[in-house]
Every structure is written in C-alpha cells, then in structure tokens.
Amino acid sequence: MASRLPTAWSCEPVTFEDVTLGFTPEEWGLLDLKQKSLYREVMLENYRNLVSVEHQLSKPDVVSQLEEAEDFWPVERGIPQDTIPEYPELQLDPKLDPLPAESPLMNIEVVEVLTLNQEVAGPRNAQIQALYAEDGSLSADAPSEQVQQQGKHPGDPEAARQRFRQFRYKDMTGPREALDQLRELCHQWLQPKARSKEQILELLVLEQFLGALPVKLRTWVESQHPENCQEVVALVEGVTWMSEEEVLPAGQPAEGTTCCLEVTAQQEEKQEDAAICPVTVLPEEPVTFQDVAVDFSREEWGLLGPTQRTEYRDVMLETFGHLVSVGWETTLENKELAPNSDIPEEEPAPSLKVQESSRDCALSSTLEDTLQGGVQEVQDTVLKQMESAQEKDLPQKKHFDNRESQANSGALDTNQVSLQKIDNPESQANSGALDTNQVLLHKIPPRKRLRKRDSQVKSMKHNSRVKIHQKSCERQKAKEGNGCRKTFSRSTKQITFIRIHKGSQVCRCSECGKIFRNPRYFSVHKKIHTGERPYVCQDCGKGFVQSSSLTQHQRVHSGERPFECQECGRTFNDRSAISQHLRTHTGAKPYKCQDCGKAFRQSSHLIRHQRTHTGERPYACNKCGKAFTQSSHLIGHQRTHNRTKRKKKQPTS
C-alpha cells in the first residue's frame, strides 16, 4: 500500500473491503508465522487509518480479535457460503471452507484512506499525531504496545538506533520482554546479517564515542550524520570553540551514553534543551580587515587610474560591509595623510585595518580624503550586504538611524552619522544630506558564525580582487551604454585590472628581461623566444602564437568582415582596425609625444615619431650596414641592392 496524501475528495466512498486482503484456507496454510503476523498488523493499521478520518467510529470486535489472536485466519468466523457480499452473482466453490461473517468494518464508508505510519509520521508532524490522539481507542493503548509495534516494523537503521537509545525499562511489563525488545532493536540497528563484525564494532564504538561527547556538541555532530568514527573526529576537530560550561567536569560520566536503562528527568530536560539550542561555533581568532584587504605599494598605486582607484575604494568598503554583516565588532583605524596626497605617507596604499572592539567601528574624515569618495558609498554598500543576507537567513533588516532633530533640519549632523537598526523605514528619505567626517557603525548582533577561518579569509580575498574589475566594467557600461559604436567598443576592450598585493610574484623573462604581472601574458611571450607556434592555419599553414591571432588571420581567407563602422558603413576584419578607423570620425588622437606635444591616432605612429627625438634606427641593412627608422625604408633600400645584382648578371653586348 503506497503512502500518499489526498489532493482532492473522491466521488465514491471507500469501504473497509476495498483495502482488505483475503486468503483461502490453502493460501493461509502456506503462510509462515511471520507472514501471518504481518497480515494481522496490516489489518490493524488499515483500521487505524480508517479511524483517523472517521473519529466517531468505535472499535469493532473483529479488531480486538485480530489484536489478541496469534494464529487468526479470517475464514473461521463463517458467513453465507454461496455468495460474496455486494457481489451476489459470483458463486463460491462449494469445496472451499466458508468465509467469515460480514464484519461491522464492511459498512464503514470514508472519503479516502490515508496509509500513515503512526511511529514514523507522528513525531515529525504534529497534525498527524493529533489524528491518532483524537481517537480514544488508540490513546488508551499501553505504551508497551507502541514500543512493540515499533519493534515489529524494522524501518531504517537510523530509526532503529534512535529507538535503541530511547529504550526505557519502565515501558516494559517485565525483564524478559525488555530483553527481547532490546535484542530486536539491536538486530534492526546493527543488521548482523548484512554487516561484518568489524562494521558492527565500528558502529558500537561510534555510538559510545557520541555518547561521551558534551550534549550540545553531540547534538550538532549527530545533525551532520557521520558514517564512521573518522568523520566524527574530523567534525570535532573542526570545532574551534566551546564554552567552559558545556565541557563535562573531570571524572563525571558522560550524559546520554548508549542504552541507559535509567535516565533522570533532569538529564532528559538537558537533552531536550540541547536539541533546541543551536550550536554556536566561533573562530579561534578574530578576522581583521588586513587579512582580507588588497594592498598596493607606492609605485603600484601610481599606475592606477582614477576609475581603478574608485573601484578599489568601493570594493574595500564592500569587504568591510561583509565583516560587519556577519556580526564582527570591529574598529577601523586610519593613518594621517600628507597634504594634497592621495595615499598615506608611511604606507603608500590606502591600508584599512579592522581590530576587535566592544562597541563601534569608526571611519574618520581622513578615510574620505584617502579614498576620494563620499559616505553615501559606505551607506549603499553596507545596506546592500545586509539586505542580501536578510534574503537568505536573517529575520531582520538594518536601516539608518533617523533622529527627529536631524529630520526636521533636513541634514544630518556634520560630526557623525550613525548606522543603527530602526523601526521606521522612511528615515532614509528624511535623513537628507550626509556629511563625510565620521561614520559610526554600531554593534550588530551576530547572525552567522564561521567554523573555519582560513576558508572565509581566502574567499573574501578572492572576491575582493575579482569584483574590482567586474564593477569597473559594469559602471563603464552603465555610463556609456547608449553611446556611439566607439564608446561601446572601448567598453568591451576594458583593460584588465592589475591585481597586485603584497607578496605577489612578478614574472621576469630570462631572455630579454621583460617583466610581466600577468602569468598568461608571460606564457605567450615565452613562445616568441622558443619559436613555438601551436596555432596553425589549415589553409596556408601559417603558425601563430595565440589563438586569437589565428582567428583574425582566418578572416583573410573567408573574407569575413564582422566589424562595421556606423558612420560610413565601412567594414573591417579586426577590432583594432575599426578602433583606429573610428578615430578618423571623432578626431581623437590619444597618443601624445612627451617631448614635442604632437599627438597621433595610432601607437605605432607615436613610436615611429619618438625615434626622431632619440635618433634610434633599429632597422639595419645586412649588406651595407645602413640603418633606418622604419622597416618600410629598409625594404626600399634592399631593392637597390637587388637591382645592382641584376645589372651585373646581364651580359655585355
């Protein structure tokens, strides 16, 4: 019988006969004792299911006989021999023994039968448990009967283990019954026919070890469902903190050891409290802002543009919001800045340190000068993190404090702005302008405790570096998304942000001494010295160092020109070619000579022009040694040598 819940009421009533299974004398004789016992249990369970949806019914006599009889066969009660109730046209074989008389249960009509297991479904659903409790006949049964029914239904090993732990001698009628019930529970839990002696021993050691743990720790470990002792040890070692109150005194026996026949009421209350209270695991050491911050040296900071510095500020503030959102009480310290300087004197990069505090975390006015931004970014970032955390598992929302005196004036105090939990969500609209001198982030209750500090630190460090570049691209697209083709192309070619932090390794080429901060670029550069060209064109056999170069070259054979100018309609097969072409329409000359101030549209033109100032002539003729500033000039010069050779080879007339 499949267990399911009703989705809609049936049109026809279901009688007890619809859910009853009958046997002939020959069939009944073929059943062994266990099968007959199972038949009796199924019939009794069907009766309980009928009663659960028809509470006014009383217990019929046949049910009592089923509960008492050890070898009951339903055909021994005698009913009319020739017909089956409700099917008079069907005749019975006269050689068969008569069927039992019509039971009062045959007249029971219910809407739909719910096949529910009281022992399994009841403890997990209060409404299902109430169905069994409302019937007086069921609630009058002795507790020992319930334990016996649990023992007769094997269930899964975990359920048997729970029943084994909850076994009480006082629920049994005598020592013999208690011993038999305990042996049956052990068989259901340990399953000696399916497990070896070593596996059974492992289960017993695991159970004893769990019983020796403190109550709260044991409750948390059991919730992780460990399968062996090694997993339990790993879980316990991962717990880095536990209060002294939860540690058992020396010499005191562990509570809740396996199969305790006598458990006091006080110990039971402690076990119930341990099941309700969540396990709080705190890190061994506080996470400081320095652990998750990305630092720059003075030279590295000078390489960053204004947009990248702005993104650095946003990501650092967002990382700080992460620390606050998980309940850390932190204090933000700053360093004095030199006049008209974007970075501190002692430490070039904006270094933000978070240390443990008992109440607040403060951002001084010099932080604003350092990061070149307003407190509004701090507000937006912290609120965003709090709202995202609330959507997952936080019951409350954090807002800014709204003081009535400040709301009436339309602006906040110029000394400080408080970030607190408030009940009025309209305070943000009334808060007015924000001053950037100081921000106080008040204590936020802990919401989530970190089990492993190292994994959290690595995750926050990685997210900080990645989001710097992602947010830069998003802001660029948001500002210039509706611009011309040139703007869109420039946005898609956003230069990757140079992710540098203290201790990072710089790649230096041993052949030419060139330095690379991106390992991918360095690997491409090494192929130039080795001559490796792994990407070969299938049409002409030409090799390339990068796959993108091969893709661009294949457009020469296919004639594909996917890049079209929106101004004149001219098409190009290379993205850089259309970028250079767009400058003819806009008149942009981004490459400027530092010596004479002359500007150029292409970087190659600037490099060629700078040779006029430096006197460099990198292209030398291998015939006569003459040098040139451009490769095209060298090619033209080499033709003069070829003409001279051809003239010498011509015969004289």
UniProtKB/Swiss-Prot annotation:
Report the Gene3D superfamilies cross-referenced here. 6.10.140.140, Classic Zinc Finger (3.30.160.60), DNA breaking-rejoining enzymes (1.10.4020.10)
Give me the stretches of Basic residues compositional bias. 459-470, 636-653
Q: Which UniProt keywords apply?
A: Cytoplasm, DNA-binding, Metal-binding, Nucleus, Repeat, Repressor, Transcription, Transcription regulation, Zinc, Zinc-finger
- Ranges for region Disordered: 139-159, 339-359, 388-414, 448-485, 632-653
Q: Where is the SCAN box domain?
A: 161-243
What compartments host this protein? Cytoplasm; Nucleus, Nucleolus
Any one Gene Ontology MF annotation carried by this entry is: RNA polymerase II cis-regulatory region sequence-specific DNA binding
Q: List all Basic and acidic residues biased stretches.
A: 389-404, 471-483
Q: Which residues form the KRAB domain?
A: 14-85, 287-360
Enumerate the SMART domains for this protein. Answer: KRAB, SCAN, ZnF_C2H2
- Domain of life of the source: Eukaryota
UniProt record, GO biological process: chromatin remodeling; negative regulation of transcription by RNA polymerase II; regulation of DNA-templated transcription; regulation of transcription by RNA polymerase II
Q: Where is the composition biased (Polar residues)?
A: 405-414
Where are the annotated C2H2-type zinc-finger regions?
Answer: 507-529, 535-557, 563-585, 591-613, 619-641
Q: Which GO terms describe its cellular component?
A: cytoplasm; nucleolus
Q: What does this protein do?
A: Probable transcription repressor. Specifically binds to the 3'-end of zinc-finger coding genes and recruiting chromatin-modifying proteins such as SETDB1 and TRIM28/KAP1, leading to transcription repression. The SETDB1-TRIM28-ZNF274 complex may play a role in recruiting ATRX to the 3'-exons of zinc-finger coding genes with atypical chromatin signatures to establish or maintain/protect H3K9me3 at these transcriptionally active regions.
Family that this chain belongs to: Belongs to the krueppel C2H2-type zinc-finger protein family.
Give the quaternary structure.
Answer: Interacts with SETDB1 and TRIM28/KAP1. Interacts with ATRX. Forms a complex with ATRX, SETDB1 and TRIM28.
Identification of the protein by name: Neurotrophin receptor-interacting factor homolog
Species assigned in the record: Homo sapiens
Q: Which gene encodes it?
A: ZNF274
